């Protein structure tokens, strides 16, 4: 007698996206992987206990739609004044030439040249105050660098020991017991003179004999 046994057969549905990706470029494959990743599906609620760094990361991702953050360069007031001055002195310079020089778009150069805005006396005083404060900060940084360089020995090795990572952490100087060079020179010269005298005495003795 033969028994009829039914064996269940499972059929798997395989997506052809992976096979199609072999025909695509590397950039398209990376975009496909990023679009299917779990990080793209992440959402957060303002009331949930999400860390601040994660909240900021997700907010930037939703704002820039997954693109890399690449802010446009903005020229300072001094650079804007130099753009206007160059255009006045050399009218043959085009917006594209100035844009290549200052690494901005020609449209930004056109807007700077078209603008008629001039700072008031109060704004000029505020700008000068900011520059003064900036100069004070630069002087403080240079002083700190000089102090740090004074702690470095001739061989490039620091002779200071900082305990702790705070700004008010104590600094201990490492003192080296180095013999004075002048004392060493005097000692060696005395020894040389004694040797010379002993040699002369030996010569005198040999001659007298």
Curated annotation (Swiss-Prot):
Presequence positions on this chain: 1-19
The entry's cellular-component GO terms read: mitochondrion; nucleus
Record key words, sorted: Mitochondrion, Transit peptide
Transmembrane residue ranges: none
Superkingdom assignment: Eukaryota
Indicate where this protein is primarily found: mitochondrion
Kindly list the places in or outside the cell where this protein is found, as annotated in its UniProt entry.
Answer: Mitochondrion
InterPro entries this protein is in? NGRN/Rrg9 (IPR010487)
So what does this one do? Required for respiratory activity and maintenance and expression of the mitochondrial genome.
Q: Which family does it belong to?
A: Belongs to the RRG9 family.
Name of this protein: Required for respiratory growth protein 9, mitochondrial
Q: Which organism is it from?
A: Vanderwaltozyma polyspora (strain ATCC 22028 / DSM 70294 / BCRC 21397 / CBS 2163 / NBRC 10782 / NRRL Y-8283 / UCD 57-17)
């Amino acid at each position: 007698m033969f028994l009829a046994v039914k064996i269940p057969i499972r059929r798997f549905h395989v997506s052809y996206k992976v096979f199609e990706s072999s025909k695509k470029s590397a950039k398209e494959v990376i975009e496909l992987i990023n679009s299917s990743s779990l990080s793209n599906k992440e959402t957060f609620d303002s009331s949930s206990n999400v860390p601040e760094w994660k909240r900021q990361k997700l907010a930037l991702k939703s704002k820039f739609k997954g693109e890399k953050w690449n802010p446009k360069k903005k020229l300072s007031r001094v650079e804007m004044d130099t753009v206007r001055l160059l255009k006045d002195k050399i009218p043959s310079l085009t917006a594209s030439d100035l844009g290549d020089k200052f690494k901005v778009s020609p449209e930004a150069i056109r807007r700077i040249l078209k603008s008629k805005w001039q700072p008031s006396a109060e704004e000029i005083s505020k700008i000068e105050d900011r520059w003064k404060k900036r100069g004070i900060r630069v002087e403080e940084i240079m002083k700190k660098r000089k102090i740090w360089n004074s702690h470095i020995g001739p061989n490039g090795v620091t002779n200071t020991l900082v305990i702790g990572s705070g700004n008010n952490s104590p600094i201990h100087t490492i003192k080296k017991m180095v013999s004075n060079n002048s004392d060493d020179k005097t000692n060696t010269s005395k020894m040389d003179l004694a040797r010379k005298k002993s040699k002369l005495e030996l010569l005198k003795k040999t001659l007298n004999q």
